[in-house]
Amino acid sequence: MNPELSLSVQYGVAEPRLPRWRLRRWAQRALDGAARDGLAECARAELSLRLVGQAEGRRLNHAYRERDYATNVLTFEYGTDPLGTARGDIVICVPVLAREAREQGKTLLDHAAHLTVHGVLHALGYDHIKARDARRMEALETAILTGMRIADPYA
């Protein structure tokens, strides 16, 4: 059985191409993929996803990572409680997302799907600090995106 998703979507910046239903679909696909992978052992995920502009993205990245620029996605993982509920917050900086999509020759939607999946996996405990963990996370992201007919973002 697939884990249940509770997703709160917040718009710090208007982005009509990224409606709640689309973000929710991508997040659920990531949650389902993580459940199949077996690393994320949760029955439920309570996540927030906030779309922000350049200034807020930069402020958050500086406050939490001491880097004075806006990054594409920030994730705050809060772990899984004893009842199996994973919690986390995901922040996607829309101007960085749009710029990267253009630079990489991707559609905004495909890149947004990738960043959403990436953020959800981080919220579930995946990381890419060690090379082995990075390979596992990237392979899972690619498999999830392939299931949505989105090309391998790492190719």
Curated annotation (Swiss-Prot):
Binds 1 zinc ion. Its main location: cytoplasm. The keyword rRNA processing applies. GO terms for cellular component: cytoplasm. Its EC number is 3.1.-.-. Keywords: Cytoplasm, Endonuclease, Hydrolase, Metal-binding, Nuclease, Ribosome biogenesis, rRNA processing, Zinc. Zn(2+) binds at H118, H122, H128. Its cofactor is Zn(2+). The keyword Disulfide bond does not apply. It is an enzyme of class 3 (hydrolase). It is found in: Cytoplasm. SUPFAM superfamilies: Metalloproteases ('zincins'), catalytic domain. Pfam families: YbeY. GO terms for biological process: rRNA processing. GO terms for molecular function: metalloendopeptidase activity; RNA endonuclease activity; zinc ion binding. It comes from the Bacteria. NCBIfam families: rRNA maturation RNase YbeY. Belongs to the endoribonuclease YbeY family. Single strand-specific metallo-endoribonuclease involved in late-stage 70S ribosome quality control and in maturation of the 3' terminus of the 16S rRNA. This is Endoribonuclease YbeY.
